[in-house]
């Protein structure tokens, strides 16, 4: 199991798919431009996500800055989100008793933050929760998560 700062990290497919895409895009960028790849948008996003997943969130998942209030509606206030710049959101839940964090979904370049838009990540994630993918129920969420995002 992957552990950081004493927390076990689990990944739902909604985040694993995006992480794999970004990792591959970052790898291609490095191959295509070994000296200038660090300025590539995919490389920057992958590094920012990696930092959030392994450092910022596990250092204190209860931090106020991760609360999303009623943006997803009152039924989903227990979901948290970490911001990457102004347009990307990483959604997760945690359980302080079992010390588990489940990363559920991160939006992509087709679903950038834009309040009121149908493709806004909050609107899309709320619909996804309503359809049960990812599950809102903690036990179901854990059952549908994996410990290594690199595995298919």
State what each model feature region is.
Residues 29-35, 66:
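A short small-residue
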Residues 51, 55-83:
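A short, surface-exposed loop/turn module that caps and links secondary-structure elements
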Residues 1-10, 16, 20-31, 71-152:
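Enriched for short, Lys/Arg-rich terminal
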Residues 35-48:
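A short, highly charged nucleic-acid-interacting micro-segment common to nuclease
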């Amino acid at each position: 199991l992957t552990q950081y700062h004493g927390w076990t990290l689990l990944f739902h497919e909604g985040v694993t798919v995006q992480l794999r895409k970004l990792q591959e895009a970052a790898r291609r960028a490095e191959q295509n431009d070994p000296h200038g790849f660090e300025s590539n948008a995919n490389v920057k996003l992958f590094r920012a996500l990696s930092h959030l997943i392994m450092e910022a969130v596990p250092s204190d998942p209860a931090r106020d800055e991760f609360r999303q209030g009623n943006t997803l509606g009152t039924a989903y206030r227990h979901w948290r989100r970490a911001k990457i710049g102004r347009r990307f959101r990483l959604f997760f839940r945690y359980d302080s008793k079992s010390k588990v964090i489940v990363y559920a979904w991160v939006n992509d370049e087709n679903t950038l933050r834009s309040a009121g838009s149908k493709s806004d990540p909050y609107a899309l994630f709320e619909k996804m929760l309503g359809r049960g993918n990812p599950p809102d129920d903690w036990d179901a969420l854990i059952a549908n998560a994996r410990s290594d995002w690199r595995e298919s």
